[in-house]
Design a protein with these regions (language model features):
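Charged interaction scaffolds used for protein-protein
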Residues: 2-10, 19-21, 26-35, 56-120
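Short linear motifs in exposed loops
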Residues: 14-16
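Short, hydrophobic/amphipathic alpha-helical patches that form generic packing surfaces
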Residues: 42-53, 78-82
Length: 120
C-alpha cells in the first residue's frame, strides 16, 4: 500500500486496478499518453482523481491548493510511480517491464552456458 500526502492530508492508496484506469479515462485523461510523454501535471491530476475518488475539476482544485500550500507536484507523481510498481495491471498497461523476464533471460543464459560446457 502506498501513502500519498496531498494538500496536507495523507491518503492510503490500494493497488491500482482496472477501475482506476477507467476512472482516469472517464475524466478525459489518457494515462498511457501522459505517462509516455512525461506529462507530470496531467499524471498528478489523474492520480489525484483516483486517490480522492473525484472528478477532474476537483482534482485540479486540490492539486492547485497542494502546490500553493507549499507541496510539490513530485509528492504526487512519486507516489503514483510507487503505486504503479505495485500494480501488475498498470505496469502492463503502461508498458513497464517486470523483473520476471530478466530472471527468465538469466536462467536461459545459465542453461546455455551449461550446454556449452557439456559440448566442450
Amino acid at each position: 500500500m502506498v501513502k500519498v500526502k496531498i494538500n496536507n492530508k495523507t491518503y492510503n492508496v490500494q493497488e491500482l486496478q482496472f477501475g482506476d484506469y477507467t476512472h482516469m479515462e472517464s475524466q478525459g485523461i489518457s494515462i498511457t499518453e501522459a505517462f509516455s510523454r512525461g506529462q507530470m501535471t496531467l499524471t498528478a491530476m489523474a492520480f489525484t482523481c483516483v486517490v480522492l475518488k473525484c472528478d477532474r475539476a476537483e482534482a485540479e482544485r486540490v492539486v492547485t491548493q497542494h502546490i500553493l500550500g507549499g507541496g510539490s507536484m513530485f509528492d504526487i507523481t512519486d507516489a503514483f510511480a510507487e503505486a504503479v510498481k505495485q500494480s501488475d495491471f498498470f505496469k502492463k498497461m503502461l508498458g513497464i517491464e517486470t523483473e520476471e523476464p530478466k530472471k527468465a533471460q538469466k536462467k536461459k543464459t545459465e542453461e546455455e552456458n551449461q550446454a556449452e560446457e557439456t559440448e566442450e
